[in-house]
Amino acid sequence: MKKKINRLSLFILDVLIVLLIGVVIFILLTGGKVFYIGTTLVRLQGVENPLTFLFILGIIRYLLSQKAPFLGLATIDKNTIAERCSTLCNRLFLGIANLETYKIYRIVLLIIGISLIIKIFNAYCFYGFFSGDDVEIHEMTFSYLFDWGTKAWNIRSPFYPMVFIFPVQAILFSLGINEPFYLIFSGRMVVVLFSALNLYLVFIIAARLFKSMPVGLFSMFFLALSKLHTTMGSSELPRTIASTCILVAFWLMLQEKNQRILVPVAGMVLAIGASIRFSEAIFLVPAFFYLFLHKRLRQAFSLVALFVVAFAFINYLSDKLYWGQPFFSLKNLVDFTILKKQSTRGFQPLLYYILSIGLWTNYFSFGLMLCSLRQNLKKIWIWVAAPILLLSLFPHKEPRYLLPVIPFYCIMVGLSVWGLLGRIYHNDFKIRIQKRISTPILVLMIPLIGIVIQAQKEPRFGYLVFLFSGLIIAVYFLQDKIKRNNGVPYQREKVNASNIAVMLVLALLGVIIFEVNGFFFRRSESGVEMARFLRMQKDNRGVAIEEIWRAGGRLYLWQKPLLLNIERSLIKERKHFVSSIKGNSIGWVGIRDNSLSRYGYASLLYDFGFKEVKFSEKIRLETYRLFKKENNDSNQEMDCSD
């Protein structure tokens, strides 16, 4: 009877493990779903929680029985797993090493093609907005297309939107296509194409730098796999194109012929990237020191000189033509962010980018990148370390700011993986490790894995990752020292290539899971659906919307006589909300569902004569609710006290 209960328990555990694996695969393929079970909203998004439960169940299953067959079908043997991982790595190494050049280029085109399809899907299906920045880019181009007479925020340089986004929109507009949806999509397609160029540039740069096409292939693969590259490459935000300029500049610096001409040209290309996004000027630092460390000092100074001249010329001319004053946006940016310190974006700690590794990449590829430090990196590390250090000094930090760093980061990861595959194939590992993992280290490692999984979505877990990692290292050396002092050193053995193969396969699996998990670029689709609905209404009364940028600002609603933004920071104040919706000029109010329920504004809107209008049947994570004022004569004096 006891054996039957144990078998049943193991079978139930196995079934739960299979179900969780199915959930993870479902989320990776669909991006997850939001749905109702009765009246309860269920959010099945992100693989972190299912993977954490899967890891816990796996540990329990292992502790209960190592010999019982999984689902009663087959026993999972550690030696068999190691052997199969080793075989897989060896086949991968030989397969790529023996590829003919034309086949490698076919794979390159295949990867670029798949990446393009994913980005086009993102750009078309997720038609919302990521931040106010993307809205402002289109507002600058739309103001010319539709002759608004007003322009966007005056701290944004017109160089990027007017040179890269405006031309394709102007062509469509001249053909009679004036629907904002298609104009916005066309702007995003420009960035999608540049992201494809970035993939090819990484391939040729890595292949040339390390004289290895497999390294170039792996580097490009990891860039295509990058969630940051994929999501930002399917938006209208400028860093993807700025990244193209940085990669082109680096490629020019690698050329062995005509260096006196090409290096100054590289400086001008860097200036274009910095003019697209001012913060990219920091890449002048790694460019200078890269040349300096290669003893090309004269070329380094010529690069800086041409950068300064080109940057000044571009910003003088673009601001003069758009704003009517040279350096207008640059001066306003310095005044707003540095002198007056009026930026409301928030401030992050100095170590934010290290603690938020899971947001801009993943801990598995980060570990692989660290492995590359033992190889000859050709000084490429400076293109990763210097920008991260400099960006860490800025008060406001976001994962997307590291987008131009990602290509160089992926080159380091690609070099590391190809090197490890070669060493596994040749069994070329000279390091020695202790035969058995001690209990204290094992006790620390188990929660560390769970913490790493959760740290992929929550930077606060980053502190625990480094805390537990430090404790493991400290315990390892402390135990070693105690044993040596007692005259009983640890028994050590040469590391087995098959064990490294297992770790590499698991690391690559982790990279794929956590990067693909971030592929689907959901934005403010509900807000845009609401704006498109309002655009079709003949009611010309004003519109008040919470965080109006989520609805596209003026992009869809510029014909409305009044657009009022209800600031998120003030919506909790009842008096502010009432002042926003009060009066006959406002006929429509759009408010996020969580704000409506949190502050109880539904009854208040009904009291002012508003009734809810359905504009979409889709269930989304971030949902807007739309209210229309039916009674224009409603001027009741309401109790506005908090």
Describe the function of each predicted region.
Residues L19-L28, K103-S131, L225, I272-I276, ...:
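Transmembrane signal-anchor helices characteristic of membrane glycosylation enzymes that use polyprenol
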Residues R84, L88-R91, F250-L270, I282-F313, ...:
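Perimembrane helix-loop-helix junctions
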Residues I120-G128, K320, M445-I472, Y476-D480, ...:
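Catalytic lumenal/periplasmic loop and adjoining terminal transmembrane helix
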Residues F130-G132, R156-S157, L228-I241, E398-P399:
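Short acidic/glycine- and proline-prone juxtamembrane loop motifs at membrane-interface regions
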Residues I137-M140, Y144, A152-P180, L193, ...:
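Short hydrophobic/aromatic helix or loop-helix immediately within or flanking a transmembrane segment
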Residues F185-F210, V248:
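Transmembrane-helix motifs of polytopic, lipid-linked glycan transferases
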Residues F283-G346, L350-G367, W381, L391-F394, ...:
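Membrane-lumen/periplasm interface segments of specific transmembrane helices
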Residues S356-W381, A386-I388, H426, T439-L448, ...:
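Hydrophobic, aromatic-rich transmembrane alpha-helices
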